[in-house]
UniProtKB/Swiss-Prot annotation:
Disulfide topology: none
Gene name of this polypeptide: ureA
One example of a Gene Ontology biological process annotation: urea catabolic process
Pfam families with a match to the protein in the record: Urease_gamma
Pathway given in the UniProt record: Nitrogen metabolism; urea degradation; CO(2) and NH(3) from urea (urease route): step 1/1
A GO cellular component entry from the record: cytoplasm
HAMAP family per record: Urease_gamma (MF_00739)
UniProt-recorded Gene Ontology molecular function terms: nickel cation binding; urease activity
Record-linked SUPFAM superfamilies: Urease, gamma-subunit
Protein name: Urease subunit gamma
Xref: PANTHER family: UREASE
Compartment annotation: Cytoplasm
């Protein structure tokens, strides 16, 4: 299988997102990279499912709460930007204050 660098990046995000999802299910608080991967993977999947940029910008703020991440993580993530593939092309999705 010959993957482009972009495809490798998406695969890495998805894999890290799965690890984060499993840790959340066990009640483990997520650290910075896990929280980033969890939200990013959800945004990428939402785009593939046909959600709009505006819907994803809102959705990204509902995925994690302060109680689900380690202390200090919300302050480390003022925004997340993901290049997602939509049915009509690639667009940048920006989520401000993703962990409230």
């Amino acid at each position: 299988m010959d993957l482009s660098p972009r495809e490798k990046d998406k695969l890495l995000i998805f894999t890290a997102g799965l690890v984060a999802e499993r840790r959340l299910a066990r009640g483990v608080k997520l650290n910075y990279p896990e929280a980033m991967a969890y939200i990013s993977a959800a945004l990428l999947e939402g785009a593939r499912d046909g959600q709009t940029v505006a819907e994803l910008m809102h959705y990204g703020t509902t995925l994690l709460s302060r109680e689900q991440v380690m202390e200090g993580v919300p302050e480390m993530i003022p925004e997340i930007q993901v290049e997602a593939t939509f049915p009509d092309g690639t667009k940048l999705v920006t989520v401000h204050q993703p962990i409230a």
